[in-house]
Structures are given as C-alpha cells and as structure tokens.
Amino acid sequence: MFPKDEFRKYAMGHQGISSLNLDRFENATAQSFTNSLTPYVIEERQMNVSVLDVFSRLMMDRILFLGTDVNYQVSNILQAQLLFLESVDPKRDIQMFINSPGGSVIDGMGIYDTMQYVSPDVGTICTGMAASMGAVLLAAGAAKKRSALPHSRVMIHQLSGGMRGTFSDMEISYNFSKQLREELYNILAKHTGKTFEQIEKDSDRDNWMRAKEAKKYGLIDEVLERNAGKDNA
C-alpha cells in the first residue's frame, strides 16, 4: 500500500512530469464521467484517515485506467504509473482497464513500449470501447491476460491524418506515416497471430468487432461473463 503523494513524488522526481500535467490528467479522467466529478474514497488505517480519489485508490491495488483519448499527458502519466508500480513490486501483475476511442499513435506507442518494458505482466480489460490505438494497447496485454466485457466493442483501422506544406514536407510526412503504419500492423500481427497482410486488409476501413469476435480475431483471450455466484447469492 502507498499514499497518493508517493506517486506524485515519483512522477515528478524520476519521470520529469510537472505538477500541472498531473493535475491535468486527473481533471481529464474526471471529465470522462457524465457528472464531471471524480468519486472519492475514505481510507481508514490505524491512527490515520485519508481521502483519495477512486483512481488513486485503485492504483494502490495495481489497477490503472485508460478512459480518455490518448495524448501526451495521458501517455506520460500511464508510463509513470507503470514504472512506479514496477518499482513497488516487480513481480505482481498490473491490470489496465481500457475505455478509449484511441488518439495519438506516437503517444500510444510510448504506453505500448512501457507495457512491454516493465517486469510485471500487464493484463488488459476492455470496458465499453477500445478503438484505434486503444485496440492496439488492448491487444498488447500479457498473453492469456487480455479480456473484454461482453458488450464491449473493439475497432481497428488504418492510420489517419493529413498533410500540408511544401511538396518535400508532405513527402517526409507521407514516409513517416507509412513507417508508423507498418509498425502498428506489425505490432497487431505479433499479438494476434495474424499475418501483416491480413492485418493490412482488415484495417482498410473501420473494422468494428464485438467482444467474442475480438477474441476470435486474437485481440483478446477471454470474454468476461457474469459471475454465476452472484445469481445464486
């Protein structure tokens, strides 16, 4: 167990993340809820009572959330959280819940590389939607530890973007985007068992899958069903 301030000190001291960006991440996470409020939890311990936002409390149990668009702020915080949890215990698994429409590929690659780099297995769970870069991160979870809730949706598609400027600048942008697309398809091929050519074909347009279809495709390993014990309680 560790207090919320301990992570802030780690992120600011070891990862160079500013206090402002930490606050922005907390605000962005809070705004993903319809009431724009982050729930708080009262944590009672011997000789001490503290109040934590629910996401910080869940991180104490090694549960992380990607519940927004992928951008540089979210990427930096998630990378710092992964590295922090590795420093606390390099052998205990980490769970990452994903409900994201995707976003910046470059920033998403930072999260992906950190997931592969840290010692603990990072299990992934889709709740709601994992689209675009969100689908890549879902598939990037540890083998046999990738799952989705029954009514989740997963979507893969080709890289999107625009170009402007001089012809030389546009040529550079095109080559960069082409290289990035190949990296993404190779990552998906690695984690799904599909060929590069199959991924390229299936990603030509928005390719939406239900949870069971995502499992069949190799993006996840399990569809999490309702616990039968709850019905008998």
Identify the residue ranges that each predicted region occupies.
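Terminal-region recognition feature
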Residues: M1-A233
